[in-house]
Amino acid sequence: MERLEKTSLKSLINQMELIAKGYFDDRKKRGTEFLNDSDNLIYINHRERFIKRVENAYLELDPLEQLVINNDFFYEDYPNWWTDLFSKNSYQYLKRRAIIHFLNVFYED
């Protein structure tokens, strides 16, 4: 998607943060509802599709991209985790590439 290539890094990060939040919120709700009406079933199916889209997008990334997406958006326990691995410029380049790749796969479904 050429549109993402021209998007600011800040905007890309915001999109990823929203997706990660939605992913964890939906995972937390998984299995907690009752299937007592069709509206609830539609909501559950929508949530399961969202979870699957996130997981599929992650699996499409190469190992370095997965490392960045995982550490920056899904398991943020280690601030500055990248400092021993990359220069700041290399990290910023890889982060942008990883986010764009993830979002391209996520939005193509």
Question: Where in this protein do the model-derived segments appear?
Answer:
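Alpha-helix C-terminal capping segments
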Residues: 29-30, 69, 81-85
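Helix-turn-helix DNA-binding module
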Residues: 75-90
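DNA major-groove recognition helices of helix-turn-helix
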Residues: 91-109
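Long, hydrophobic, amphipathic alpha-helical segments used as structural scaffolds
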Residues: 27, 65, 106-109
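Short amphipathic alpha helix immediately N-terminal
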Residues: 60-76
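Non-catalytic, well-ordered alpha-helical scaffold segments
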Residues: 48, 52, 66-67, 96
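N-terminal interaction/assembly modules
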Residues: 1-60
